[in-house]
Amino acid sequence: MRYTNIVTSIIKYQEKILLLKRSNKVKTMKNVWSGVSGIIENDDESPLSRAKIEIFEEVGLVEKKIELLKSNKQIEIDSQQYKNHTWNIFPFLFQVETPEIKLNWENSEFVWIDPNDIVNYKTVPALKQILFDLL
């Protein structure tokens, strides 16, 4: 069995949450909606520091513009794309004071939605569970 450690961050602005549509240029889960996510690249890196790096890279928010509201213990989900592969997901909830973001190439669209509306979007696996566990 192979394991990959990843972070998934939900970003909240007032009562809305940010969803990102993964572009067709990414390696996995193309054209589905997600939070801000990324692989923890080495054992010396903490999940929180990786989450902040991914937020800056994917939506252009520097650390002083985000506030950590909550983190949960990791969850494991089996990969839908790779056999004998498990994703260890470290979930975070951040808050921002402004809805202004700048997408990079990893995502093609973004929306701010009411959390309950997530059921209307095709998302990466476990995103709904992660979201409602954090809220």
Ranges and model annotations:
Residues 1, 9, 25, 84, ...:
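Short secondary-structure boundary/capping segments
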Residues 1-18, 39-41, 93:
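Conserved N-terminal beta-strand and adjoining loop/helix that marks the start
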Residues 1-3, 29-32, 82-88:
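A generic structural micro-feature
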Residues 13-16, 23, 95-100, 115-117:
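Short loop segments at secondary-structure junctions
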Residues 16-57:
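Conserved Nudix-box catalytic region and its N-terminal flanking loop in Nudix hydrolases
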Residues 60-100:
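Active-site segment of metal-dependent pyrophosphate-handling enzymes
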Residues 91-93, 102-132:
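NUDIX/MutT-family hydrolases
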